Every structure is written in C-alpha cells, then in structure tokens.
Amino acid sequence: MCGHGDNPACATAIDPKVAAEHGPALAVAGDKFGQGITLAESISIDTLLANPDAYVGKRVRIEGQVDDVCRMRGCWFNLKGDKPGQTMKFKVTDGEMTFPVSAVGKWAVAEGQVRKMPLTLEQTVKVKQHEALEQGQPFDPASVKEPMTIVRLDGLGAVIRDKK
C-alpha cells in the first residue's frame, strides 16, 4: 500500500456492498476518476466531521477545493472544509486512481465510504512520520504525545475541475 510500509493510514477498507450500491455515474463536469459521481447530493465536510459516527460505513458525496495531493503515488487528496484549517482526506487503493499534483487549487466532488480509524500512539507516530516524509519535513517521534483518530473518505469516485 502506498509503498509506505506498515503505515495504518495507507490501506483502504471499502465494504463491497457499499461499493456496489450506486446508480449510473451522473454527468458532473470535470475529469472523472474511478466510478465518477453517482450520488446527487453532497454533505458538507463540516457536517460530516461534526458527527462522523453518523456516517461511518456509509457512502457519501463531499465537495471542496483540493488542498493537497499525495506527491508519492497520487493515492489521496485533501479537500478544504468550511472552517479554516479543516480538511477531509479522500484516499484510494494504490493504482485504482491516480490524482495529479496539478489538482491542488481545483474543485473536487468526491464519493466514497466514510471511515473512522482510532489509532494507537505507536500507529499515530508512524502516520505522522509518513506525513512528514511526504511533505519533506523533519519529524521528531517524541513530539507525538497522544493517539489520534483519522476520519476520511475511502474513495470510490471523484471528479476534479477548475472551479466550483
């Protein structure tokens, strides 16, 4: 996964039933990835993050400006939420879809299964270390003091376009 060893945040886990429950792809303008977009309505990233347990395991559609893209494999992108500093990661299995770094600053409509991953302290260190490596930033494992919980969208389809 990701070519990143045993980083727990690199694997996706989409329920086959959730992956199968969709209609035809909608005509959403932009570059299509994976299944494209099949749900007509988006929920806000703010709404999802305010109560992630209500959405865990469900197929949802979100939208936002692409804030960052995996520079190593193109296997994820982050979408900006409604609040400053708020983002939601859209992660796919390596090779299923590859997102270009040029997507940063563009608008994305993304669809997938909401996943919540409570991590141990050791797993949190691995995730933070991997993120620092991807960003070319220094990392001190001692800086991680408590475990984190990741809430993200394991991706089924996306459309990326220049603007909203």
Predicted regions and their residues:
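OB-fold and OB-like single-stranded nucleic-acid-recognition modules
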Residues: M1-K164
